[in-house]
Design a protein with these regions (language model features):
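Mg2+-dependent endonuclease catalytic cores in nucleic-acid-processing enzymes, primarily RNase H-like
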Residues: 1-116, 158-169
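Charge-patterned, long linear interaction tracts outside catalytic cores
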Residues: 96-157
Length: 169
């Protein structure tokens, strides 16, 4: 694979355009793409939907309440889902920054017994930068959704790469 693709400090329109280009260029397309809709990410999400990917783009807000009540918030739940997937064999291309960010995360228990991930500010203090890569990977586990089911005709239409002349086969 290509590893991680990222863009630093781009405006929302450029980021949305770059995402849409990468999605359309991909031979195997993801069923879903979660967008961090806190702050400027909301504009990227809106534009990606306007560009026709509203069936793929899903809004994600890590400050929301967790689906599972054992977690303090959705951010904690996302990172737990990621850790669980890694234990089950989930693989990402090796990336030194991602490894550093993931290893910097710690957790504690709240007085009412909920699992709480350390704050983003604590991570920034520990590693000297924002944990952008680990947040992006964890965001893919915002919700555990089933794979999309495709009809055979939809699959062929989606993945057809060129027009084959009549009689070529």
């Amino acid at each position: 694979g290509r590893g991680f693709i990222g863009w630093e400090k781009k405006d929302t329109m450029e980021t949305a355009s770059k995402f849409t280009y990468e999605y359309n260029a991909a031979y195997i397309k993801p069923d879903y793409a979660f967008f961090d809709t806190i702050g400027v990410g909301a504009g990227v999400f809106d534009r990606v939907c306007q560009l026709g990917l509203d069936q793929v783009a899903l809004e994600a807000n890590a400050s929301k309440k967790a689906t599972n009540p054992i977690y303090f918030n959705k951010r904690t739940e996302m990172y737990h889902n990621l850790a669980d997937a890694v234990k089950k064999g989930f693989y990402t291309p090796y990336d030194e920054e991602l490894e550093e960010e993931l290893l910097a995360h710690t957790y504690s228990l709240t007085p009412d017994g909920k699992i709480k991930l350390c704050s983003k500010d604590e991570i920034k203090e520990a590693i000297g930068r924002s944990p952008d890569k680990s947040d992006a990977v964890a965001l893919t586990f915002f919700e555990l959704l089933p794979a999309q089911s495709y009809k055979k005709d939809d699959f062929a239409q989606t993945y057809q790469q060129s027009n084959i002349p009549s009689g070529a086969w």
